[in-house]
Amino acid sequence: MSSLTLFIFFLQLFIFTSSVSGISIKRCTEEENNTWEIEVGLCIQTENFRAIKTGCYKIQGPGGLLTEGNGFKIFAHDDCSKEETQNNFILDSVNKAVYALGKYVYMEISTSNITTLYSLPQCAKRISLSISCDQVTTEMKSYVESVSFKDYDLEFVITTDISCVKHVSSSVIVRNECEKKYISTGKKIFGFNNKIDCSAVKFSEHVNYLKTCSVGKFDRKKYYEHQHNYIKKIFHHNEL
């Protein structure tokens, strides 16, 4: 191959690379770069009971949210006090799917269209999710996992009642709209074999089975004493 041929080859390669790079830069708008979503996925394998398809209900409070249905409750809240929050707990959507005749439940708790991720107060970036079973009336036997995203100063803590839950695999995704379109990034998975497959359903297929949880109404009579601390965090009650 002559020197001229090599020169032409590398020139074409440079032009192509520059062109592709330029296209990549222009693909995302400023709005897409500054609009974020957070998604927490929980694959819950039940122990000694089957999660019946009783429906799923979401109850939102100023400091968090809770879900009811399928034999357990999930309490999600941040670390903000009544004085620190503006009634804007960042997770606001709950979807669920029941697999394998109730042996597995996949829960997705998420939010989208966040434009203030970096300016959120520190307390709002500390998010706790606790899985508590309806059939357990005493203090939880807890297993705790945590994951952090240092670039965004976000931390997630997941607590599971292992007296009625055999296993939980979890994923947390934090990404902006640009990353969602073009890059598989911002995802952290922890749990069994670093997978979030649930029963025979792969992670990418959950979207085909998820149903949106209905809006429910809070009834304090449904909650045991060991769950009251979560309720106080979610609704900013000093006592129950």
UniProtKB/Swiss-Prot annotation:
Gene3D superfamilies: 2.60.240.30
Top-level lineage group: Viruses
InterPro entries: Apoptosis_reg_M-T4 (IPR016399), M-T4_sf (IPR038687), Poxvirus_T4p_C (IPR007579), Poxvirus_T4p_N (IPR007580)
Family per similarity comment: Belongs to the poxviruses B9 family.
Protein's recorded name: T4 protein
